[in-house]
Design a protein with these regions (language model features):
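Generic alpha-helical secondary structure signal
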Residues: 1-4, 169, 176, 193, ...
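Basic, flexible linker segments flanking DNA-binding modules
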Residues: 2-97, 188, 242-251
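Short, surface-exposed connector motifs at secondary-structure boundaries
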Residues: 37, 125-127, 151-156
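RNase H-like polynucleotidyl transferase catalytic core
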Residues: 72-74, 157-161, 176-194, 210-215
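An active-site-proximal beta-strand-loop segment
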Residues: 96-127, 133-135
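Active-site beta-loop-alpha junctions of metal-dependent nucleic acid enzymes
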Residues: 111, 129-151, 163
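Acidic/histidine-rich, metal-coordinating catalytic segments
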Residues: 144, 151-167, 240-244
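C-terminal domain-tail junction helix/linker
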Residues: 177-179, 201-254
């Protein structure tokens, strides 16, 4: 027998036949969702694009294509009851604890607008938003009333000590409905960690990336992002499933 170098006998490893399409889909999703890491992209590929791929393969392609993995956010402090007790009020089921908060942004003419965000702490779903130049306590009540009709009444609602939330009108109205109010310590936004996390994602993924020329445009884009957050965006705390999978919308158009 003729001697032959072992190096010439090595099997040439060819990339899978679907590698090109998978790479294309990963790049498309990474472009659309600039703050998502490869694990969330993997979840989107499997949930929405019909792939059955593990995160290690996606990570390999991710790094080969020079895509940047976003830095992890620091862990937030624990949430405590505002009576100073050492028992953390954890949401244990849907509608157990809601929380709400305000955000501020501007249109291109420099005028400020406010965003009221309301979430279910257990499901992580954003239940509703209000986007206006100015939001009064009565408008907060009106939005909560709308959500109570549609979703039912929560047992608790958590907020900071902003005047819109501590106003007598809203506190009395909630008390009449049997909703217990939880107020965080002043200057301690981490105690309202669930809604602060949501607000941070909206800031990163939308507000810091968009320019709003009018209030109407801001309303449309913010509501569009809310629906995508609820119905499409994989959430790590929910096993990389969206907060409201029962209303999931397909990303793939036919």
């Amino acid at each position: 027998m003729l001697e032959q170098s072992r190096s010439t006998q090595r099997r040439i490893v060819m990339p899978p036949s679907d590698e090109k399409q998978l790479t294309s889909d990963i790049i498309a999703l990474a472009t659309k969702y600039g703050r998502y890491g490869y694990r969330r992209i993997t979840a989107l590929l499997n949930n929405e694009y019909g792939w059955s791929v593990n995160h290690k393969r996606v990570e390999r392609i991710w790094r080969n294509e020079g895509l940047k993995v976003p830095k992890k956010q620091p862990k937030r402090s624990r949430l405590w009851l505002n009576d100073g007790s050492c028992i953390r009020l954890r949401p244990e089921y849907k509608d157990h604890v809601w929380s709400y908060d305000f955000m501020i942004d501007r249109t291109t003419n420099g005028r400020v607008f406010k965003i009221l965000t309301i979430i279910d702490e257990y499901t992580r779903e954003c239940l509703g938003l209000v986007v206006q130049r100015r939001i009064t306590s009565q408008e907060v009540i009106d939005k909560l009333f709308e959500l109570f009709i549609l979703r039912g009444i929560p047992e608790h609602i958590r907020s900071d000590n902003g005047p819109e939330f501590t106003a007598k009108a809203i506190r009395r109205w909630l008390a009449r409905l049997g909703v217990k109010t939880l107020f965080i310590e002043p200057g301690s936004p981490w105690e309202n960690g669930y809604v602060e996390f949501f607000n941070g994602k909206m800031r990163e993924e939308l507000l810091n990336r968009e320019v709003f020329t009018t209030l109407g445009e801001a309303k449309v884009l913010i509501e569009q992002w809310r629906r995508e957050y609820n119905q499409v965006r994989p959430h790590s705390a929910r096993g990389y499933r969206p907060p409201a999978p029962e209303t999931i919308l397909s990303l793939v158009t036919t």
